[in-house]
Amino acid sequence: LLSDARAEAVESSVSELERLAISHDASHYLLVPAGLVRPDSAEDVANIFRAAGDLGLPLTFRSGGTSLSGQSSGDGLMVDTRRHFKKIEVLEDGKKVRVQPGATIMMVNNYLAPYGYKLGPDPASWSACTIGGVVANNSSGMSSGTKYNTYNTLDSMVLVLPSGTIIDTAEPDADQKLRSLEPELHEGLLRLRKRVLENPESMAKIRQQYSMKNTMGYGLNSLVDFETPVDILQHLLIGSEGTLGFVASATYRTLPILKNISTGLLVFDNLIDAARSVPELVANKLATVELMDATSIRVAQRTGQAAEALAAIDVKDHAALLVEFQGNSEQELSDLAAAAAPMFKSLPVASPVSMTSKLSERNALWAARRGLYTTVAGNRRSGTNALLEDVVVPVEVLGNTCSDLTKLFDSHGYQDSVIFGHAKDGNIHFMLNEQFRDPKQLDRYRDF
């Protein structure tokens, strides 16, 4: 296959050094690929798909490698898209943008900023994560929630199927082309949609599950939300972790940049009080509500660069919520703050609520949250693995969920665990540090 790739002028390598170098990503898995290719077009990928299919060789696509779950690792053929798939094309004066999978969120937003727009997805790893992974994981982030994730802001994509078929879903005849080139797939998607629509219980379950952040399995909501197979297919690829095909480019509908913003840190005596305050904050139109537990705060303080509001906390069992109002104008921002004032006074906070619109102060607060995972993971005991889980529950039961988690940590001896995340969406991360070379520690992890 690599000989064929070289004949087609596609970069390829079986060098042990290169294979070892690309085997490392942000996860704790280590799988060394058998070979490496760096295509520079959708047609190259189509040819690689066909050749790999003939040989029964599995493919893994790799862009930023920032996922903590190991999706960018594999021991078959590694298809590296970081070098040649970085094109960014601003469309309609910034209202849309066409992006290839090797471009980072930060790169795209830098292109869009002069037009006053940005992408919807805003993960904490925005400076390093790439569009390929953002599509493959249906990434959202701090304020995008489910409303502005890739699934809900995608306009079209150029996709490559394992058969080598290339479809540009923006073309008027895209669905006809799919039916002509992939009749079995086209018909199968229609049958699946019909099956779901004829089952009210399935419909209700899908609606309920996808009212929250949900990237478990394939995006079955596409069978409910879209009618044509080509629309269903392109939305099934979102969140499919690279298992259904390759996204050679994605065109997004963008969001206007709101310049009227105020940010604050709400400090609580304990995690449960903080978590149980979230529904009220959501009801009062806070654009972001980010949770940090006591361990998160301590780690942020130890960097020596924590914002004044964070550095001032005498941490015991405290927790904090980083919150933000966003408005189209100063008046809208003022109205949001005024409407929420009675709610702020009713919260069981440990210190007075203070909001700031100063960019330097806001950036200092956000720096602690955006760098939280790397800072916490970097402070773990030597020889341990940082294991991050990602769960979502209805916001109304977030407090009970955090309470149950802390009891689990205590009962299994995970005193150094951390809870943080996107509380506005009921989406929290918790981190365990474990030493897997010790059989007893492995048993503890299994029991947990």
Residue ranges and their predicted role:
Residues 27-59, 81-123, 139-191, 256-269, ...:
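N-terminal glycine-rich flavin-associated loop
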Residues 44-58, 112-129, 217-237, 364-367, ...:
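Short, hydrophobic/aliphatic alpha-helical segments
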Residues 134-136, 143-147, 154-370, 374, ...:
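C-terminal substrate-binding/cap subdomain adjacent to the FAD-binding core in PCMH-type
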Residues 379-406:
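Signature for HUH/AEP ssDNA processing cores
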Residues 1-54, 64-95, 124, 172, ...:
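N-terminal flexible segment immediately upstream of the FAD-binding catalytic core
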Residues 59-61, 68, 264, 274, ...:
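Extended, hydrophobic alpha-helical segments in both membrane/secreted and soluble proteins
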Residues 1-9, 47-55, 111, 276-285, ...:
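Generic non-transmembrane alpha-helical segments
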